A protein has these predicted regions:
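The feature captures the beta-strand-to-loop junction immediately N-terminal to the Walker
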Residues: 51-53
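Non-catalytic connector elements of ABC transporters
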Residues: 2-4, 253, 263-361
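Helix-to-loop junction immediately C-terminal to a conserved catalytic motif
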Residues: 66
């Protein structure tokens, strides 16, 4: 896939970025609650990813903002104005869907120009704007091609150009990469992010892919059962998750039994300080990430090497403690030869674990 060039001369960028606010937003479908009092603010010009498992409410929130779905209560504001009574076609938002949703009987150029045609723009203006946008997404040579003559990645870039044609102040992306193969998905991920930064357009990006959210977004909002668990930068979300759900949904975690001490917890006979709160009761576990676990060969060590998964520069080892707890550790691949399956190791944890949580029921 060709990487899109910088904006062509004359391409009009977004006419000012918008602030988007969800206030106490609720939506139910029968007995199922999709959104349970969502409060979230999207800053002007940022790309915010809505991340969470299926059914968490992320697409419902996007569709309510777009005007394709009604809400039960709460408000959706753009620059302080409640837009929930405004028809979808007047909301100044462009949307890109997972399924591309291109018109099969229209060429790439006519697909991009369709919204302009509906707005009453003249033929010359439509063609000029559509060609500028095709240049922007790197597909001017596909102007007269039809959707069936293009790859999935090319079709999605046409859909993106179409969404930008009316110069919306908010861009909505509903899992736009999930139908693409891995290589094209990675390329288009980088391209969307670059275009978003160049255009300065406020963007909401729905995804269930943690890597996609962390690599593209300025901030990530993690939803669970219609509620906001945490909204933070990717580094903060990964390194300082607010809840055990966030910690385990974003990246890999191991849970290791621990006991409470006066100033922290004790794990495998060693004391550790804890930054966050420690639950007052129940069986406790520390949560640690594989890259923060160290293993060294030790004939009588507490960890039995069970398996290894090659990941390139690192290899992920799974070790089992005497109580049956399994812990994952990422080691440089060249160091793994000293720790074959069946060998024992000494296990060292970070001075401060990511989180302390009650043992799940």
């Amino acid at each position: 896939m060709t990487t899109a060039p910088a904006p062509a001369a004359g391409v009009a960028l977004a006419p000012g970025s918008a602030t988007v606010e969800f206030r106490s937003l609720r939506r139910s479908f029968g007995a199922t609650t999709a959104l349970d009092g969502l409060d979230l603010t999207v800053r002007p010009g940022e790309l915010l990813a809505l991340l969470g498992p299926s059914g968490c409410g992320k697409t419902t929130a996007l569709r309510i903002l777009a005007g394709f779905e009604q809400h039960d209560s709460g408000e959706v504001l753009v620059d302080g104005r409640d837009i929930t009574s405004i028809p979808a076609h007047k909301r100044d938002a462009g949307m890109v869907f997972q399924s591309y949703s291109l018109f099969p009987h229209l060429s790439a150029l006519d697909n991009v120009a369709f919204g302009l045609r509906m707005r009453g723009a003249g033929k010359a203006e439509r063609r000029k704007r559509a060609l500028e946008l095709l240049e922007l997404v790197g597909l001017p040579h596909r102007a007269e091609h039809y959707p069936h003559q293009m790859s999935g990645g090319q079709q999605q870039r046409i859909a993106l150009a179409r969404a930008l044609a009316l110069q919306p102040r908010v861009l909505l992306l509903d899992e736009p990469l999930s139908a693409l193969d891995a290589k094209v998905r990675l390329q288009l991920r980088e391209e969307i992010r670059r275009l978003q930064q160049e255009l300065g357009i406020t963007t909401l990006f729905v995804t269930h892919d943690q890597e996609e959210a962390l690599s593209m977004a300025d901030r990530v909002a993690v939803l669970r059962a219609g509620r906001l668990e945490q909204c933070a930068t990717p580094s903060e979300l990964y390194g300082r998750p607010a809840t055990a759900f966030v910690a385990e949904f974003v990246g890999t975690m191991s849970r290791i039994p621990c006991t409470r001490t006066a100033d922290g917890v004790e794990v495998l006979g060693r004391r550790h300080a804890v930054d966050g709160e420690i639950p007052a009761d129940g069986e406790l576990q520390v949560l640690v990430r594989p890259e923060n676990v160290s293993l060294t060969p030790a004939e009588n060590g507490p960890a039995l090497v069970v398996s290894a998964s090659f990941l390139g520069a690192v290899t992920r080892l799974t070790v089992r403690l005497d109580d049956g707890t399994e812990v994952k550790a990422d080691l440089p691949t060249e160091a793994v030869a000293a720790l074959p399956a069946g060998s024992r190791a000494e296990l060292t944890l970070p001075e401060r674990p990511v989180l302390v949580d009650r043992r799940p029921a």
